[in-house]
From Swiss-Prot:
GO terms for cellular component: chloroplast; large ribosomal subunit. It comes from Sorghum bicolor. This protein binds specifically to 23S rRNA. The globular domain of the protein is located near the polypeptide exit tunnel on the outside of the subunit, while an extended beta-hairpin is found that lines the wall of the exit tunnel in the center of the 70S ribosome. Its main location: plastid. Keywords: Chloroplast, Plastid, Ribonucleoprotein, Ribosomal protein, RNA-binding, rRNA-binding. This is Large ribosomal subunit protein uL22c. Part of the 50S ribosomal subunit. It is found in: Plastid, Chloroplast. CDD domains: Ribosomal_L22 (cd00336). Gene3D superfamilies: Ribosomal protein L22/L17. The gene is rpl22.
Amino acid sequence: MTSFKLVKYTPRIKKKKGLRKLARKVPTDRLLKFERVFKAQKRIHMSVFKAQRVLDEIRWRYYEETVMILNLMPYRASYPILKLVYSAAANATHYRDFDKTNLFITKAEVSRSTIMKKFRPRARGRSYSIKKTMCNITIVLNIVKKSK
C-alpha cells in the first residue's frame, strides 16, 4: 500500500522580463532620462488585444528596426501603429532635433477606449447589439547616447 503526502499548493508567479530585455539591448546608463518624445493616438477602431500583439513585438527596439518589423507584419493593426511611430519620430526630429538612428522605443502601451454600440436588425422584429471597440495607443521614444 502506498502512502500519499499532502503538500500545500502554491501557484508560480511569472517574473516580468521587460527590464532584462532593455538591459540586453541598451545599457540603462546610456538612456537619457529626460530626452523623450511622447505620442498618443486616441480612438483607433481596433481591439485592444489585436493592438497589444503588435506592440509587444516593437517594444524595446530601435526606430529603424521597428519600422522594418511593422512593414513586414501581416496584421491589420500594424498600419495605424506604423503611422504613429512615424509621427513620433518626425516630431522628435523636427521639434527636438534628435537623430532617427538614436531613437529607441521605451514604452508602447494600449488602453481601452470608448465602445460604440450599434444594432443589427434580425428576424421577427428583434435586434442584436454589436459592440465596436476602440483603443488608445501611446508610444514613447527615448534618445540613446552614442557609446564613446
